[in-house]
Amino acid sequence: MKIDILTLFPEMFYGPLNSSILKKAQEKGIITINYINIRDFTTDRHHQADDKPYGGGAGMVMKVEPIIKAYEAIPKNNSFTIMLSPQGRKFNQKLARELSQKEHLIFICGHYEGIDERVRQLIVDEEISIGDYILTGGEIAAMVIIDAVARLVPGVLGDEVSAEEESFSDQLLEYPHYTRPRNFRGLEVPEVLLSGNHKKIDLWRKKQSLLNTLFRRRDLLKVRGLTKEEKILLWQGFFELAMLIDEIPERSE
């Protein structure tokens, strides 16, 4: 199995992924792990890989261009790209088994406030979360997944051992993040984030957060519940989706 890790902090991986079972697996050639520093694919002299979010708000957002350039520089063969995200599929042993069947895994580790939404749209096959809590970045989550998956790759534990025996804010998922450029490969930043109208921006973000949670982690809403105003926002979101569907021409069978 080949594993490529896109990160701003490759040094975080050197100890955990180069010791014990994982070290032996790499020495045997069963697993190959490469660390790609996203800053190496920036174009400015300061190697800036993040920028202020469109629409305002706290924190910085990781830029789309250096991540895509780093991704495109990786030789690929049946690759499967994972972005570590609190709004992703919950990681468990079943998912670890699925991933252990892949030939090539690519991990994208977020940091700061988040990653430009267009990264997910362009290259991500699966978003994965390791739990309902907040970490500084995706690096530790990637280590958890890599460790769990590697143990299931044939030959890693040895024939004598059977592997089979062996942030949330307000309980809602986050809204999509965007930063410069405004247009990337035809994917535009939502117009409302460029309006300067902070009331509209706040409503859009709350609506997207509610829709994200409903579609991806409905179990959180069942525990949390919804206010009357939040239900209205969701219905508005459904209406907007219906309008988009109506704009698509019918296809003759």
From Swiss-Prot:
Please give an example of a GO cellular component term from this record: cytosol
Q: Which UniProt keywords apply?
A: Cytoplasm, Methyltransferase, S-adenosyl-L-methionine, Transferase, tRNA processing
Residues the entry annotates as binding S-adenosyl-L-methionine:
110, 130-135
Q: Molecular function (GO) terms listed?
A: tRNA (guanine(37)-N1)-methyltransferase activity
Q: What class of enzyme is it?
A: transferase
Name the Pfam families on file: tRNA_m1G_MT
- Please state where this protein is localized: Cytoplasm
GO biological process terms, semicolon-separated: tRNA N1-guanine methylation
Q: Please list the reactions this protein catalyses.
A: guanosine(37) in tRNA + S-adenosyl-L-methionine = N(1)-methylguanosine(37) in tRNA + S-adenosyl-L-homocysteine + H(+)
Keyword field contains Repeat: no
- This entry's Enzyme Commission designation comes to 2.1.1.228
Q: Which PANTHER family match?
A: TRNA (GUANINE-N(1)-)-METHYLTRANSFERASE
Q: Which family does the similarity line name?
A: Belongs to the RNA methyltransferase TrmD family.
What HAMAP family does this protein's entry cite?
TrmD (MF_00605)
Per the entry, what this protein does is:
Specifically methylates guanosine-37 in various tRNAs.
- Outline the subunit composition: Homodimer.
Official protein name in the record:
tRNA (guanine-N(1)-)-methyltransferase
State the organism named in the record.
Carboxydothermus hydrogenoformans (strain ATCC BAA-161 / DSM 6008 / Z-2901)
